[in-house]
Curated annotation (Swiss-Prot):
Matches recorded under NCBIfam families: IMP_synth_hisH
Protein name: Imidazole glycerol phosphate synthase subunit HisH
Organism listed in the record: Haloarcula marismortui (strain ATCC 43049 / DSM 3752 / JCM 8966 / VKM B-1809) (Halobacterium marismortui)
EC annotation from Swiss-Prot or TrEMBL: 4.3.2.10, 3.5.1.2
Chief location bin: cytoplasm
Chain ranges of the Glutamine amidotransferase type-1 domain: 9-232
Keywords, in A-Z order: Amino-acid biosynthesis, Cytoplasm, Glutamine amidotransferase, Histidine biosynthesis, Hydrolase, Lyase
Role noted for this protein: IGPS catalyzes the conversion of PRFAR and glutamine to IGP, AICAR and glutamate. The HisH subunit catalyzes the hydrolysis of glutamine to glutamate and ammonia as part of the synthesis of IGP and AICAR. The resulting ammonia molecule is channeled to the active site of HisF.
Record pathway: Amino-acid biosynthesis; L-histidine biosynthesis; L-histidine from 5-phospho-alpha-D-ribose 1-diphosphate: step 5/9
Domain of life, per lineage: Archaea
Location relative to the cell: Cytoplasm
Quaternary assembly: Heterodimer of HisH and HisF.
PANTHER family: IMIDAZOLE GLYCEROL PHOSPHATE SYNTHASE SUBUNIT HISH
Length: 232
């Protein structure tokens, strides 16, 4: 009789951008065995991969260039891939961030079809601080999230806003998936934007906010990710 694995081995991609220490600590609190890696060959043995990131989209994609092929291959093979903040934006097809610098749209990993766009000039950027999540559909990443400081869910039993003191954001661009079904949760900052996204298969997902800095809700999401890695 086989013994069920109880600890997920998670690789955090070290491509030179991102708050690696806080992400690592958050995942460890969530029960993962975490390793930082600059070697795509180490993805094979991992139960899951986390792509963190803070900074400019173009720089992120340039730095992640050596990882690109391996990330796409692992994701297409069904391995759980979790993008955080810039890492979430990199999961999409393009970003207009470089276009504001006169360079045209920058290409992402194209694992979730869509584009990253800038908040309107009427909004103060970056969007920084605590804000609410409105869970719009089921996904393993948000299982139980509505029960953590939640407001009243919809009549059909789905959705509900998480108390705004549980999701911490720092960003000037936001994801616009081509397909609305890719949106798992939204947040209002002058406009409703996708704050959690996932691909059709469900194994590639991202949060625009930093779960490792988002209190009990963030910890719940990280635990859900670790559980997902163990189950898949």
């Amino acid at each position: 009789m086989s013994v069920r694995q109880t600890t997920a081995d998670v690789v955090v991609v070290d491509y030179g951008l991102g708050n690696l220490r806080s992400v690592t600590r958050g995942l460890e609190r969530a029960g993962a065995n975490v390793s930082l890696s600059e070697d795509p060959a180490e993805f094979d043995a991992a139960d899951g991969i986390v792509l963190p990131g803070v900074g400019a989209f173009s720089e992120g994609m340039d730095n992640a260039g050596p990882f690109r092929e391996a990330l796409v291959e692992q994701a297409e093979a069904g391995k759980p891939l979790f993008g955080i903040c810039l890492g979430m934006q990199m999961l999409l097809t393009t970003s207009e961030e470089a276009d504001h610098e006169g360079q045209g749209d920058a290409e992402g990993l194209d694992l979730i079809p869509g584009k990253n766009v800038r908040f309107s000039r009427d909004q103060t950027v970056p969007h920084m601080g605590w804000n609410e999540l409105d869970v719009t559909r089921d996904h393993p990443l948000v299982e139980g999230v509505d029960s953590v400081g939640s407001k009243t869910p919809r009549a059909d039993g789905t959705g509900g806003s998480v108390d705004g003191e549980h999701a911490y954001f720092v960003h000037s661009y936001y994801a616009v998936p081509d397909d609305e079904s890719a949106t798992v949760a939204t947040t209002d900052y002058g406009t409703d934007f996708a704050s959690i996204v996932a691909n059709d298969a469900g194994n590639v997902f991202g949060t625009q906010f930093h779960p490792e800095k988002s209190g009990e809700t963030g910890l719940r999401i990280l635990r859900n990710y670790v559980d997902y890695c163990l189950d898949h």
